[in-house]
Amino acid sequence: MLDSIPLFPGLPGGPELLIVLLIVVLLFGANKLPQLARSSGQAMGEFRRGREEIEEELKKGAEGGDDEGENGDEAEADDADATETEAESR
């Protein structure tokens, strides 16, 4: 019985898209639609650029190995020792 009920019926067809478009026009007004489309396009472009930058950083990190993490930990330990020495000298 449950196998015959689709949970996700698929993409909306023509009549459904027209209803959604009508609701969008009623909510935002016909004059604001180009501005809304422009701003959503810019947001999608920024999201895409950010995703690509993160993917590049992950690839560089995978190629470089874990050497950077080990050096960073040593540098933090040296900074902590220097801070302790300064505190003791006061």
Swiss-Prot record:
The keyword Protein transport belongs to this UniProt entry's keyword annotation: yes
Keyword DNA damage applies: no
Job description of the protein: Part of the twin-arginine translocation (Tat) system that transports large folded proteins containing a characteristic twin-arginine motif in their signal peptide across membranes. TatA could form the protein-conducting channel of the Tat system.
Biased composition (Basic and acidic residues): 46-63
Any one GO CC term of the record: TAT protein transport complex
Native species: Haloferax volcanii (strain ATCC 29605 / DSM 3757 / JCM 8879 / NBRC 14742 / NCIMB 2012 / VKM B-1768 / DS2)
GO molecular function, one term: protein transmembrane transporter activity
Localization (cell): Cell membrane; Cytoplasm
Acidic residues bias spans: 64-90
Residue intervals passing through the bilayer: 8-28
BP-aspect Gene Ontology terms: protein transport by the Tat complex
Annotated spans, Disordered: 39-90
Family: Belongs to the TatA/E family.
Name of the protein in its database record: Sec-independent protein translocase protein TatAo
Membrane topology: Single-pass membrane protein
